[in-house]
Curated annotation (Swiss-Prot):
CDD domains: S1_IF1 (cd04451). The keyword ATP-binding does not apply. This is Translation initiation factor IF-1. PANTHER family: TRANSLATION INITIATION FACTOR IF-1, CHLOROPLASTIC. Belongs to the IF-1 family. SUPFAM superfamilies: Nucleic acid-binding proteins (SSF50249). Transmembrane segments: none annotated. Keywords: Cytoplasm, Initiation factor, Protein biosynthesis, RNA-binding, rRNA-binding.
Length: 72
Protein backbone atom coordinates (compact mmCIF):
# COMPACT_ATOMS: atom_id res chain seq x y z
CA UNK A 1 0.00 0.00 0.00
CA UNK A 2 1.51 3.32 -1.06
CA UNK A 3 1.38 6.61 0.80
CA UNK A 4 -1.23 7.85 -1.71
CA UNK A 5 -3.72 5.20 -0.58
CA UNK A 6 -4.03 6.37 3.04
CA UNK A 7 -6.91 8.55 4.23
CA UNK A 8 -5.91 11.41 6.57
CA UNK A 9 -8.51 12.72 9.01
CA UNK A 10 -8.60 14.98 12.06
CA UNK A 11 -9.90 13.78 15.41
CA UNK A 12 -9.88 14.13 19.18
CA UNK A 13 -8.43 11.58 21.59
CA UNK A 14 -11.16 10.29 23.91
CA UNK A 15 -9.31 7.69 25.96
CA UNK A 16 -5.81 6.25 26.39
CA UNK A 17 -5.85 2.44 26.29
CA UNK A 18 -3.13 -0.10 27.15
CA UNK A 19 -0.26 -0.84 24.72
CA UNK A 20 -0.10 2.73 23.35
CA UNK A 21 -3.57 2.48 21.80
CA UNK A 22 -6.05 5.35 21.83
CA UNK A 23 -9.75 5.74 21.18
CA UNK A 24 -10.15 8.65 18.76
CA UNK A 25 -13.36 10.37 17.68
CA UNK A 26 -13.05 11.66 14.13
CA UNK A 27 -14.59 14.94 12.95
CA UNK A 28 -17.20 12.87 11.11
CA UNK A 29 -18.35 11.43 14.46
CA UNK A 30 -16.95 7.91 13.99
CA UNK A 31 -14.87 6.34 16.78
CA UNK A 32 -11.75 4.35 15.89
CA UNK A 33 -8.79 2.67 17.60
CA UNK A 34 -5.42 4.22 16.77
CA UNK A 35 -1.80 3.60 17.69
CA UNK A 36 1.13 6.03 17.70
CA UNK A 37 3.41 6.22 14.68
CA UNK A 38 7.07 5.30 15.14
CA UNK A 39 8.38 8.87 14.87
CA UNK A 40 6.05 10.11 17.62
CA UNK A 41 7.11 7.18 19.79
CA UNK A 42 10.84 7.76 19.16
CA UNK A 43 10.57 11.46 20.05
CA UNK A 44 8.53 10.74 23.21
CA UNK A 45 5.54 12.83 22.10
CA UNK A 46 2.91 12.52 24.86
CA UNK A 47 -0.68 12.11 23.73
CA UNK A 48 -3.39 12.72 26.32
CA UNK A 49 -7.19 12.59 26.20
CA UNK A 50 -8.53 15.80 24.67
CA UNK A 51 -5.62 16.29 22.24
CA UNK A 52 -6.39 17.08 18.60
CA UNK A 53 -4.58 14.60 16.34
CA UNK A 54 -4.19 13.71 12.67
CA UNK A 55 -4.93 10.06 11.94
CA UNK A 56 -4.05 7.97 8.88
CA UNK A 57 -6.62 5.32 7.97
CA UNK A 58 -6.18 2.41 5.60
CA UNK A 59 -8.90 2.05 2.96
CA UNK A 60 -9.11 -1.64 3.90
CA UNK A 61 -9.97 -1.21 7.60
CA UNK A 62 -11.63 2.08 8.53
CA UNK A 63 -11.92 1.17 12.23
CA UNK A 64 -8.16 1.31 12.96
CA UNK A 65 -5.60 3.99 12.31
CA UNK A 66 -2.20 5.48 13.05
CA UNK A 67 -1.72 8.81 14.85
CA UNK A 68 0.82 10.79 12.81
CA UNK A 69 0.55 14.29 14.30
CA UNK A 70 -0.53 15.95 17.54
CA UNK A 71 -1.78 19.52 17.20
CA UNK A 72 -0.12 22.16 19.32
Amino acid sequence: MSKDDVIEMQGTVLEALPNAMFEVELESGHKILAHISGKLRMNFIRILPGDKVTVELSPYDLTRGRITWRAK
